[in-house]
């Protein structure tokens, strides 16, 4: 009820486990399915997505634990942003339901659009899968509109935006960014 009544421009939900991409392979740790996230609770997950999709503002599900970073557009109003790993090896794409690096993907009842991800083919030795990424979330609700060059005058955007920026953990270089505008004026 709190989310539904919120007057915030954006709603953020944090989950310690992934929401849309499965962890069905264990590789070195476990050879069989070790999926222990929202991807095994289809009914509950669909109820959440359907409720969030009816919100007046975008809903961002921030997740981790899958050992890869990715951005998934679940619906026009619901997104998943995952960041990691920070201190352990990445997973092969085969450990994650044979998902593509980007594009359409379906695991369970709902097709999603993977906008970007770290993605590792299974011909890479596991000890070479150390590719940490981190995500910086920036909310732009004002912009500088000075009356004189070099001045400062902050003006509110009619529709603020959130920018999710993914950086390489080794080099600090920007790898991907996704911007989402508020849906209501």
Language-model segments: which ranges?
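Long, structured stretches of catalytic cores involved in phosphate-ester chemistry, encompassing
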Residues: 1-185
């Amino acid at each position: 009820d709190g989310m539904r009544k919120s007057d915030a421009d954006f709603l953020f939900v944090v989950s310690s486990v992934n929401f849309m991409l499965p962890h069905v392979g264990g590789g070195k740790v476990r050879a069989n399915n070790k999926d222990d996230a929202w991807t095994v609770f289809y009914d509950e997950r669909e109820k959440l997505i359907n409720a969030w999709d009816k919100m007046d503002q975008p809903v961002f599900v921030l997740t981790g634990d899958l050992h890869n970073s990715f951005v998934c557009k679940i619906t026009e109003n619901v997104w998943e942003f995952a960041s990691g790993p920070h201190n352990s090896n990445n997973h092969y794409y085969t450990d994650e339901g044979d998902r593509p690096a980007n594009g359409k993907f379906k695991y369970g009842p709902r097709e999603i659009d993977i906008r970007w991800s770290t993605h590792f083919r299974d011909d890479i030795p596991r000890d070479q899968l150390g590719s940490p990424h981190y995500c910086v979330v920036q909310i732009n609700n004002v912009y500088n509109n000075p009356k004189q060059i070099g001045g400062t005058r902050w003006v509110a955007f009619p529709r603020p935006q959130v920018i999710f920026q993914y950086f390489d953990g080794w080099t600090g270089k920007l790898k991907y960014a996704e911007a989402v505008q508020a849906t209501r004026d």
